[in-house]
Amino acid sequence: MPKVTNLNHRLRNIMKSKKTLLAIIIAVAVVAIAAVLLIIKPWGGNDDNSSSSAPDSSSVADSSTPDSSSATDVSSSEPEEPAKPLTPVDYYGEMKVVDGKIVGSKTNELVRVTGMSFFWSNWSQKYYTKDYVDYMVDDYGCEVVRCSYGVMDDGVPYDTSCEPLIEDVIEQAIERGVYVIIDWHSHGAHNNPDEAVRYFGELAQKYGQYDNVIFEVYNEPTQVLWKTVKEYAEIVIAEIRKYSDNLIIVGSPQWSQKVMNAATNPIEDENVAYTLHFYAGTHGKWLRDEADKAMDQGIAIFITEWGSVNADGNGAIAKQSTEEWFQWMDEKGISCCNWAINDKEEGSSIFVKDSNNELTETGIYIKELIKQRTDNAPWKKAS
């Protein structure tokens, strides 16, 4: 029966093939089901019988809510950054004139900050850098720096290429949390208010929202009537006020010494102070008396420039007179900036000519004075 035998043999082979195919199909199905189960519920999930080695429930996301607990766990495992120390601007905030005093908007306390003034920008560009801001803050202890944008007597800047450098100083002062005065450093600014309007308008738009920034619209008027200075200042102030309510400082006639002129006819703006300039080798009690009378009339004073030598920038350090001025400023709570960050061969420069930041006798003395004042500042005690 060969044909029957062959038929049986073929049937057995077909049955084996079907069984093999069925086994393969079953195996594939099992693998697929297992994969689906793993996707739906990761291995070792939230079963009541999970072992102690399973992940904590707080680290497993709930499908119905954001995984906030997981984010917390991750952040808590990272080392915490040390708290940043307070800076003068952190502590005081924006400077405001209230009842003839300059106070901090955050503390409502009298603000008394001390620092340095840069020299004329057109003659000292090498110092208008972020590194020198850091040097003044870290080495001298400055709470404020002053940018002196050099402007000719016709009211036109000597060199507009200085403007980006001044902005570098402004931005680094903001970064370091100290105040920065933007000074229109001229003896004849009233002759061309348009240039000042352009410049202060641009910077007020760019930096006027920062508490650090103070605008000084006229450094030192000389032999000019206060009426003329006031008219110029009002034009520039109106432009600044389009963008910023920050403190504005205005100079007065005779190299910013006739503050009584301003006191008897002040500018109508809620946040304006007036600058008084002194040089200890030349100016004494008579100028302090003038300032006292002006403050009694209700105006605020900020000494944006002072020197320990003669008014021409030369001469020896007048230590006794300087100490008398500082005692008076401490009693009145007046802020000040020393002249000047420069290496010109004159008594007021803090650096030796063409040196690598070697301090002059003046530089050493001024550094000690500033640090004595700022080391005991309220913002440091609050840190």
In which residue ranges do the predicted regions lie?
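N-terminal, intrinsically disordered, polar/charged segments of Gram-positive cell-envelope systems
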Residues: 47-88
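Amphipathic alpha-helical coiled-coil/heptad-repeat segments
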Residues: 29-40, 59, 64
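Hydrophobic single-pass membrane-insertion segments
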Residues: 36-50
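Aromatic-lined substrate-binding rim segments of carbohydrate-active enzymes
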Residues: 129-188, 192-198, 237-243, 318-332
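N-terminal Lys/Arg-rich, disordered targeting/topogenic segments
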Residues: 1-16
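N-terminal substrate-binding region of glycoside hydrolase catalytic domains
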Residues: 83-164, 187-191, 302, 308-313, ...
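N-terminal Sec-pathway targeting helices
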Residues: 12-29
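Extracellular glycoside hydrolase catalytic/binding regions
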Residues: 90-96, 120, 125, 141, ...
